[in-house]
């Protein structure tokens, strides 16, 4: 009863008599006296039981406990530090100091003073009572593995090293910089909080030491504080610059090649150009210069990972000035970090000036191509481009090839343009390629209306109007040109297009196209077809793959492992050409037999049809789309010959010949006679019939997987988590990945969380 009084007295206990209450109070008083006598022994027993209980969380192995703690947020981890010494030891040594985020210049100053004071983690929970749970004190600067600088500033650095400065003490500063006056206010606020705090955690000596160190670094600029922090963290492997503004710049004064010599300062003050890769082709380097440069290069600090994430908030607001608002990559952005092994760029624009090679400011590898010929290469071995724009033209691909010769791992994430796949051929040492298949350039392709495939009629002359007005006296609507002017999006045409029987540039080919003025792209999906695929939850990547198939086939594949990420396989399966043509041949045969039995039952149908939703007025709509199922029917008198029909027939003939040689069932099949006796125009060109285009995603998936089979190894990461993926057995995965497994390529499939769903041939 006494423990329930912590929540207050309830009005429902008023029914108990006062005498009974007094008796209960006397009993509770005796119990309290007894509990005071045994308090010490009770604490010891409870403490021993707490740590000896095998069912408690603390008895879990350290690896398991770390996995559990890794799922918690930062605030929860800070709260758990006060539970006991083991939690404090694990959290401080494994989580709190591993990934540091600094969001202001004041936070940089505080953290810089903290690590220079040789701060050690200590046990907050005093006298835990068990030697096995005592915290191990470690130096905080040795625990930091990653550090992030949010919204880095460069105005104070530009002001410090500019010849214009504030002489009169005014707030306006020349040279495009501004004065940071919020520092003193932040310091006063922090001091007030520190003085008013009733439970100080650190001692007064520690506070005095931190204040002294802060005063020593008070006049440092933002970039100087950043570099000083990086230099004082020996185990640092990752540096992140996030929310970088487009006007952010790092002056060349902070280059790692700045040795304090007068020659280096003269180059910057006079604006002298550094030696570049182009200069090495015209000038001869002395052996002394090469030896001195190599000694400087190999003595530079090394950084494993550098990430630069541009701030894209302004880009969404000012769409008209999007190109000017985006952060443009310049060599000065990473000239102060030393030799970088892995570079990750996000929302950054890359142009020809981004790949400049100033070897006297930027650490570049000087490679001896020949006895007297040298070339400059970036030391980066892993490159990640996330939502980056590559400005085309001016030999950008050639510069990529010469600049990133040492890159072995390339990752293209959230690709903005499908033509960025051409960059994959610009890395001579490439061995591992990662492509994001859920990028907008693969899922948001252009779709057209059905009128795209027909010749538009214009009613310009009076005779046309008279003819159309006279049509109202009959039961027929105005006739429209039902001839298709470009290869339509049917399964047969898309398959012939993917197998190179039809060229995507046939619009300009006089030999294949009788009307070369027609520059329309073939097999463009219509809006109705895309809606049909979306209702079936078919991924857009497989629906549009024939749009960019040529770009995927141009990817380098020799001795290269590919990692395909964010790709779904919902409601699709690989349909091989032989299976498709075999099914189509059976369908054509069954349709012909049915037509012979039906006879003349459909004589009452009209020869010309229109869409049901077309407007039927006295003056017909010139953009009305013909109903191809009626126009291309065997009873129709309208027959058109298309230049792509022969290409589709050749694709069908070659597949039937292969099928005849492989299958006993079709050995007696006369291929030429079969092609002459059947009518194929309806199956080839009627893109309005769902039966004629339903297999486009399945055909595209087969071509996509067949293209992946050319690589050394294939790794696939699904778009969704395991619980949201289509449940498949190992046999189902083998059927899905059959085009890849036929060539014995090692393949591995994981879900979004990294759980292995299928593996074959992996070591």
UniProtKB/Swiss-Prot annotation:
Q: Write the record's keywords in alphabetical order, separated by commas.
A: Cytoplasm, Phosphoprotein, Ubl conjugation pathway
Q: Which residue positions does Phosphothreonine occur at?
A: 594
The superkingdom listed in its UniProt entry is Eukaryota
CDD domains, alphabetized: F-box_SF
F-box domain residues: 54-100
Matching SMART domains:
FBOX (SM00256)
* A GO term for molecular function: protein-macromolecule adaptor activity
Q: Which GO terms describe its biological process?
A: protein catabolic process; protein ubiquitination; regulation of sulfur amino acid metabolic process
Q: What happens when the gene is disrupted?
A: Stabilizes the adenosylphosphosulfate kinase MET14 which leads to accumulation H(2)S and SO(2).
Q: What is its main location?
A: cytoplasm
The record, for Gene3D superfamilies, names:
1.20.1280.50
List localization entries: Cytoplasm
Pathway as given in its UniProt record: Protein modification; protein ubiquitination
Q: What else is known?
A: Present with 432 molecules/cell in log phase SD medium.
Quote the function comment for this protein: Substrate recognition component of a SCF (SKP1-CUL1-F-box protein) E3 ubiquitin-protein ligase complex which mediates the ubiquitination and subsequent proteasomal degradation of target proteins. Probably recognizes and binds to phosphorylated target proteins. Regulates protein levels of sulfur metabolism enzymes. The SCF(SKP2) complex may regulate some transcription factors or regulators of cysteine and methionine biosynthesis.
Q: How does this polypeptide assemble, per the annotation? A: Interacts with SKP1. Component of the probable SCF(SKP2) complex containing CDC53, SKP1, RBX1 and SKP2. May interact with ribosomes.
Under which name does UniProt file this protein? F-box protein SKP2
């Amino acid at each position: 009863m006494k423990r329930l009084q912590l929540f207050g007295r309830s009005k429902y206990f008023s029914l108990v008599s006062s005498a009974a209450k007094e008796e209960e109070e006397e009993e509770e008083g005796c119990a309290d006296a007894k509990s005071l006598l045994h308090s010490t022994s009770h604490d010891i027993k409870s403490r021993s039981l707490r740590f000896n209980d095998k069912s408690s969380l603390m008895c879990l192995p350290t690896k398991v406990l770390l996995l559990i703690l890794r799922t918690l947020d930062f605030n929860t981890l800070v709260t758990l530090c006060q539970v006991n010494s083991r939690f404090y030891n694990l959290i401080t040594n494994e989580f709190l100091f591993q990934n540091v985020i600094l969001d202001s210049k004041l936070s940089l100053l505080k953290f810089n003073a903290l690590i220079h004071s040789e701060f050690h983690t200590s046990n907050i929970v005093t006298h835990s009572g068990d030697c096995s749970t005592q915290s191990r004190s470690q130096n905080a600067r040795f625990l930091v593995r990653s550090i992030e600088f949010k919204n880095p500033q460069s105005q104070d650095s530009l002001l410090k090293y500019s010849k214009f400065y504030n002489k009169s003490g005014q707030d306006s500063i020349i040279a495009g910089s501004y004065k940071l006056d919020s520092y003193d206010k932040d310091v006063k606020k922090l001091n007030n909080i520190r003085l008013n705090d009733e439970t100080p955690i650190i001692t007064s000596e520690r506070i005095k030491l931190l204040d002294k160190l802060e005063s020593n670094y008070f006049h440092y600029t933002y970039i100087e504080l950043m570099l000083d922090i990086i230099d004082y963290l020996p185990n640092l492997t990752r540096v992140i610059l996030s929310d970088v503004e487009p006007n952010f710049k790092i002056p060349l004064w902070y280059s790692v090649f700045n040795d304090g010599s007068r020659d280096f300062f003269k180059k910057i003050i006079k604006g002298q150009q550094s030696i570049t890769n182009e200069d090495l082709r015209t000038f001869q380097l002395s052996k002394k210069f090469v030896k001195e440069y190599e000694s400087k290069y190999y003595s530079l600090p090394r950084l494993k990972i550098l990430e630069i994430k541009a701030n894209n908030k302004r880009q969404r607001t000012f769409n008209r000035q999007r190109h000017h608002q985006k952060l443009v990559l310049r060599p000065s952005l990473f000239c102060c970090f030393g030799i970088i092994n892995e570079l990750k760029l996000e929302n950054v624009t890359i142009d020809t000036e981004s790949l400049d090679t100033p070897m006297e400011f930027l650490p570049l590898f000087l490679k001896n191509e020949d006895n007297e010929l040298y070339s400059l290469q970036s030391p980066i071995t892993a490159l990640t481009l996330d939502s980056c724009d590559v400005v085309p033209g001016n030999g950008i691909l050639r510069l990529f090839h010469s600049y990133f010769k040492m890159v072995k791992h390339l990752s293209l994430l959230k690709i903005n343009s499908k033509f960025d796949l051409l960059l994959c051929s610009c890395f001579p040492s490439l061995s591992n390629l990662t492509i994001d298949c859920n990028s907008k350039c693969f899922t948001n392709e252009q779709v057209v209306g059905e009128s795209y495939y027909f010749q538009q009629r214009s009613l310009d002359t009076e005779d046309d109007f008279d003819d159309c007005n006279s049509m109202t006296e009959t039961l027929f609507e105005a006739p429209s040109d039902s001839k298709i002017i470009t290869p339509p999006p049917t399964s047969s045409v898309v398959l012939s297009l993917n197998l190179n029987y039809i060229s995507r540039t046939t619009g300009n080919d006089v030999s294949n196209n009788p009307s070369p003025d027609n520059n329309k792209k073939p097999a463009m999906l219509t809006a109705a077809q895309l809606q049909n695929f979306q209702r079936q939850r078919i991924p857009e990547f497989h629906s549009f793959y024939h749009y960019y198939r040529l770009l995927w086939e141009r990817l380098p594949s020799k001795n290269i492992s590919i990692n395909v990420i964010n790709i779904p396989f919902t409601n699709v399966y690989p349909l091989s050409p032989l299976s498709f043509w075999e099914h189509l041949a059976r369908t054509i045969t069954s349709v012909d037999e049915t037509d012979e039995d039906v006879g003349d039952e459909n004589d009452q149908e009209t020869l010309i049809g229109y869409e049901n939703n077309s407007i039927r007025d006295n003056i017909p709509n010139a953009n009305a789309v013909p109903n191809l199922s009626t126009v291309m029917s065997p009873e129709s008198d309208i027959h058109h010959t298309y230049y792509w029909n022969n290409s589709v027939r050749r694709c069908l003939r070659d597949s039937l010949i292969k099928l005849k040689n492989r299958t006993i069932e079709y050995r007696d099949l006369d291929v030429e006679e079969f092609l002459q006796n059947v009518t194929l125009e309806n199956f080839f060109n009627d893109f309005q019939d769902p039966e004629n285009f339903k297999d486009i995603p399945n055909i595209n998936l087969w071509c996509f997987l067949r293209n992946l089979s050319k690589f050394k190894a294939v790794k696939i990461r699904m778009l969704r988590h395991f619980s949201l993926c289509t449940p498949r057995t190992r046999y189902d995965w083998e059927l899905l990945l059959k085009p890849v497994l036929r060539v014995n390529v090692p393949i591995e499939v994981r879900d979004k969380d990294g759980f292995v769903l299928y593996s074959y041939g992996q070591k």
